[in-house]
Amino acid sequence: QAYSAMQNPVLKSSSTSGPVFAPRGDWLKAGELRRNPDLARTYRAIADQGRDAFYEGDIAREIARYSEENDGLITYEDLKRHEVEWQEPVAISYRGRTVYEAPPNSSGHVLLQELGIFEHFDPQEYGYMSSESIHLMVEAKKLAFADREAYLADPRYVDIPIEGMLDPAYLSERAQLIDVDNAAENVVEGNPWEYMSRRPDSRKKHREAGRLHKVGSDTTHFCVVDRWGNSVGELQSIQTAFGSCVIAGSTGILLNNRMTYWHLDPDHIDYLNPGQKVRHTMNPLMVFSAPVEQGGKLELVCGTPGADTQVQTNMQIVTGIFDYGLNVSEAIDGPRWTHVQAGMGSAYPHKDIESLQIEDRVGEDVMSGLQKLGHPIQSTGAWGGAGSEGAIQVDIKNHTFFAASDPRREGDALVW
C-alpha cells in the first residue's frame, strides 16, 4: 500500500534502488515479487559474523564507499565508532500507575508531560471523545510540544532539565495555563529549571528563561509479552517512506533520511552539530501498576509509528484505557485526533500550519464544539487518523493478555 502510494522518482531512478523497486524501469504490479538478493547476502553476513560485519566489516566499507562516491557524509569511521547506549527510562505517576518512556533524545517525555498535565482534570467530568476532553488533551499537547521545541536535543551536547519537566509541581503550573473555554493561540515553553535541584551545566548548550545559552514516516513498531510478564517494545525507523530512497551500493540496505529533523538555525536547541544525535519522535511505552522497584506489574505495552503524532496517539490510548475504562481494542479503534502545531513540526522545513485533524466518527456536535473553542478543524474521514498502534494489555488479576492492532494501517495482533 505504501509502496504504490509513494511512487518516489528517486526510488525508481537510482542505479541501486531502481532494479529492486522498479525493475524493467517500471513499478512492480500487484502479485509481482520484489527481489533484493544483495540484502539477503547482507543478512546472512550479519547472522554469520555478528554486529562487526555491519559496523566494521565489508558491509561498512561498502556503505562508506557508496557514500563517498555520491557526495554523502557517512564514513567508515562513523560506522566503526557506533555504540548502542543502555539508558534508564523516564517515568511519571499517572492516576496511581507508573508510566515509563524512552529518555532523551527521544520525545518520550512529551507523552509523560501530556499525561501529567491532563491528570489535573477530572476525565469523568467530560465524556470520552467529547469536545471538552479532546480540547483539554490538545491543549496539554501544545504545552508539552512547546517544551520539547525549547529543550530537547542530544543530552550529550545539551543540558536538558528533564527532572524539572516531569516534576508534578511544574506540570501543575503548566496545567493552570489551560483555558477550558478557549484554544490557546500562542503557546511558549515554561521554565522547568526552577524545579531542578541543580543549575544548568555551563559546559553544555542549554535554554533557560527563554534564552539559549551556548558553549563558547518509515517507522515500524512491535511489542511482545511472554507468560512470565517479560516485555519488549521496539520502534525502528528510516524516517519517511523508503528513507532516502537510495540503496547503499551492493548492500541492499536503504539509507535513512533522519537528518531532516535537524534545525539549521544556530539559535535552535536542536541545531546540527558534528557527532551529535538528532532528536527523534520514537517513544515505546509501558505502564506498570506501580514503580518496578516496588514490585509493579506490567499492565500495558504499546507504540505506533507516526513522527509527531506518536505521543498524541499514545496519549489517547492510555487515557482511553485508564481514564475511560476501554479495553485495548476499543481504545485503538476509537475516533482519533492529531494536532499540528504551527512552526513546531519535527521535519524540515519546520513550517507546519496549525490544525486539529480529527476523524468524523466523533460526531458533528463534537466537531462543532471544538470549532467554537477556537480549534481549526480538518476532517480525516471515518478512519483516516494518524498512526498504526499496536498494544498488549495485561489483566494482572486474571493473568490474561489482550492484544490489538490498528485497523487504520497494516498490522497484526496474536495471543496464544
Residue ranges and their predicted role:
Residues 86, 216-219, 280-282:
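Short, small/polar residue-rich loop motifs at catalytic or cofactor-binding pockets
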Residues 33, 47-64, 68, 183-188, ...:
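Alpha/propeptide regions of enzymes that mature by internal proteolysis
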Residues 73-75, 225-300, 307, 311, ...:
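Active-site rim segments in enzyme catalytic domains, especially the processed small/beta chain
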Residues 1-50, 54-56, 60-106, 166, ...:
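Noncatalytic scaffold domains of N-terminal-nucleophile
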Residues 1, 61-65, 128-145, 328-338:
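Short, well-structured alpha-helical segments that form the helix of a local strand-helix-strand
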Residues 228, 276, 314-315, 323-384:
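Extended C-terminal subregions enriched in glycine
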Residues 25, 120-238, 250-251, 258, ...:
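Internal maturation/activation junctions in enzymes
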Residues 97-104, 111-115, 123, 222-224, ...:
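Short, well-ordered beta-strand elements
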